[in-house]
UniProtKB/Swiss-Prot annotation:
Quaternary context: Homodimer. Heterotetramer of two MnmE and two MnmG subunits.
Cofactor: FAD
Protein name: tRNA uridine 5-carboxymethylaminomethyl modification enzyme MnmG
SMART domains documented for this protein: GIDA_assoc_3
SUPFAM superfamilies attached to this UniProt entry: FAD/NAD(P)-binding domain
Any one of the GO BP annotations: tRNA methylation
Subcellular location field: Cytoplasm
Chief site of localization: cytoplasm
Length: 621
């Protein structure tokens, strides 16, 4: 009998199986195609707004995604450099073939992981507890717990124009039939969602004179806090072009053969990643939309047309591409398509990602209604950790909204109504100044170390970094820069003169004044700091902490107040009908979502502040 069975080997499944195995559990990974482990079926990239922060959080907890992209990335960029540090988000293009191979190699090296190429068609239970999985041969494999990471495979249906095919992720991959029905028979409620992907084109047929080059950063920021040294491969460029009014006219021609507009697609698509035809329909006043041409790897001519996700007929897709500058003679390797799939409403899971109906059964990834590799990987990691912690009768790992973007993601899933694919944004996190990509290791290393995923050397390295940050901050608060040196720097930055010696931390709070400029101005200051640390990452944290000190303190106080609400637990079987005074909508939503604490209850749509007050009085708070 296995300790943990993971069903599906996408990004959620990979993190789940690795976390459980590295924590010492005996694990089985079941997937319908072992050559497609961690396949990037859509965009060949990791990171981006909020997603880059999640990837670094996965790394800080001891997950693998950050190392995988560092090893197989072909272009690295830090987005939103012109904005504040809360908005900085790392992103990297991946060699999609190498990424999949990397993750398979890592999984095969783990001695606690067995692999099985098969399809799970049902789960088996004993009472209300998970007991095993049934595969296509009807054989039952017993396990103490299971994590379902089925992606878009559940009754997957692919649409290209008015044609549709059964498919799990691509036309070449069969869907999983029967598992949704089996879970519904156990009492779960399922819904239907849609996502899509753009056509792929031959890079040799692009006219590069008509597109704008977008190179990677000269000094790339890697994702893993453990990654050191040079990139594994030479960086490649992406390219930017845009649709035209002619493009829009061509695509409108195909609306009558669009599964989106003719009602053939019943699933709800992602609001913030719409198809190109949906953008044209929803924003008729816009004359053009940006198109990003992204290479799929070093040794392939295949290019991903980001911004042109579509399920229009093939002939319309190609004609539309030919109307875009630089793509007049482009050759289409494979068309874009939409895929519909089943998911399960996430109010049916707990904060640990264990299902409410069946004990020791966990859901992670798109089965919970999310979109994106990073969101899936984060859920897989947390499900893997919590499955093992529960098996050992240890306290679960539940990250709060002020701990991590991962905490925001899971909290949103279980408290908000999800009827469209959920994706993470920086705006989703009310504590985003605390949850930066650069401090993920500082925020989360204790959690990763406690559960046994973060190795000793990384834990100690982070502890040392924190000690150096504190020592540098203490030193800077005690040092004053004499007025001559201070004015020399301020004049260069077009500030007015100051009189008397200036405290270094006061100078550092000014816009455009950086620690690097202060050190260049004062060799003595540089020497004093060098005695503590020469680590630029330490200096970066010191500068951010100093510049945003007031905001950070205020945010921390707000987070502390919210934490007090999180400490007020609600009994799992509380009878909401017995609580007089609750609004009808509030009672209905509380009964549906079954919040675990007052904080969660307060974030449920439809539960009013007066409902929360009544609930707290009833619980004697």
């Amino acid at each position: 009998m296995y300790d943990v069975i993971v069903v599906g080997a996408g990004h959620a499944g990979c993190e789940a199986i690795l976390a459980a195995a590295r924590m010492g559990a005996t694990c089985l990974l079941i997937t319908s195609d072992l050559t497609a482990i961690a396949r990037m079926s859509c965009n060949p990239a990791i990171g981006g707004m909020a997603k880059g922060q999640i990837t670094r959080e996965i790394d800080a907890l001891g997950g693998e995604m950050a190392k995988a992209i560092d090893a197989t990335g072909i272009q690295f960029r830090l987005l939103n450099r012109s904005k504040g540090p809360a908005m900085h988000s790392p992103r990297a293009q991946a060699d999609r073939t190498l990424y999949s191979l990397y993750m398979r190699t890592i999984i095969e090296r783990e001695p606690n992981i067995d692999l099985l190429q098969d399809t799970v068609i049902a789960i088996e239970t004993k009472g209300e507890c998970f007991a095993g999985v049934r595969i296509t041969s009807s054989r039952v494999i017993e396990g103490k717990s299971a994590i379902l990471t089925c992606g878009t495979f559940l009754n997957g249906l692919i649409h290209v124009g008015m044609n549709h095919f059964a498919g799990g992720r691509t036309i070449a991959e069969p869907p999983v039939v029967g598992l949704t029905e089996n879970l519904c028979a156990h009492g779960f409620q399922a819904g239907r969602l849609k996502t899509g992907t753009p056509p792929r084109i031959d890079s040799r047929s692009i006219d590069y004179r008509k597109v704008d080059e977008q190179p990677g950063d000269i000094e790339p920021i890697l994702f893993s806090f453990e990654s050191k040294g040079a990139l594994q491969s030479k960086q490649v460029s992406c390219f930017i072009t845009k649709t035209t009014e002619e493009t829009h006219a061509i695509l409108r021609k195909g609306f009558e053969r669009s599964p989106l507009f003719t009602g053939k697609v019943q699933g709800i698509g992602p609001r913030y990643c719409p198809s190109v035809e949906d953008k044209i329909f929803r924003f008729p006043d816009k004359n053009s939309h940006h198109i990003f041409l992204e290479p799929e790897g070093i040794d392939t001519n295949e290019m991903y047309v980001n911004g042109f996700s579509t399920s229009l007929p093939e002939d319309i897709q190609l004609e539309g591409l030919h109307s875009i500058p630089g793509l007049e003679q482009v050759k289409m390797i494979r068309p874009g398509y939409a895929i519909e799939y089943d998911y399960f409403y996430p109010h049916q899971i707990q904060a640990t990602l264990e299902t409410r109906l069946i004990e020791n059964l966990y859901f992670a990834g798109q089965i919970n209604g999310t979109s994106g590799y990073e969101e899936a990987a984060a859920q897989g990691l947390m499900a893997g950790i919590n499955a093992v912690l529960k098996m050992r009768k240890h306290e679960p790992l539940i990250l709060t909204r002020s701990d991590a973007y991962i905490g925001v993601l899971i909290d949103d899933l279980i408290t908000k109504e999800t009827n469209e694919p959920y994706r993470m944004f920086t705006s989703s996190a009310e504590h985003r100044l605390l949850l930066r990509h650069d401090n993920a290791d500082i925020r989360l290393h204790e959690f990763g170390y406690r559960v046994g995923l973060l190795p000793e050397h990384r834990y100690q390295a982070t502890r040392q970094k924190i000690e150096q940050i504190n020592a540098v901050k203490t030193l800077l608060s005690q040092i004053r820069l004499e007025s001559g040196l201070a004015n020399k720097l301020l004049q260069e930055l077009e500030y007015g003169e100051v009189t008397g010696a200036q405290q270094v931390t006061t100078l550092l709070k000014r816009p455009r004044v950086t620690l690097a400029k202060l050190l260049a101005t004062s060799p003595e200051l540089h020497s004093q700091l060098s005695n503590i640390s020469n680590n630029p990452l330490v200096y970066e944290q010191v500068e951010i902490d100093c510049k945003y000190e007031g905001y950070l303190k205020r945010d921390a106080l707000v987070a502390e107040k919210i934490q007090r609400l999180e400490a007020h637990h609600i009994p799992a079987l509380l009878d909401y009908h017995a609580i007089a005074g609750l609004s009808n909508e509030g009672r209905e939503k509380l009964k549906k979502h079954r919040p675990e604490n007052i904080g969660q209850a307060s974030r449920i749509l439809g539960v009013s502040p007066s409902d929360i007050s009544i609930l707290m009085v009833h619980l004697g708070r």
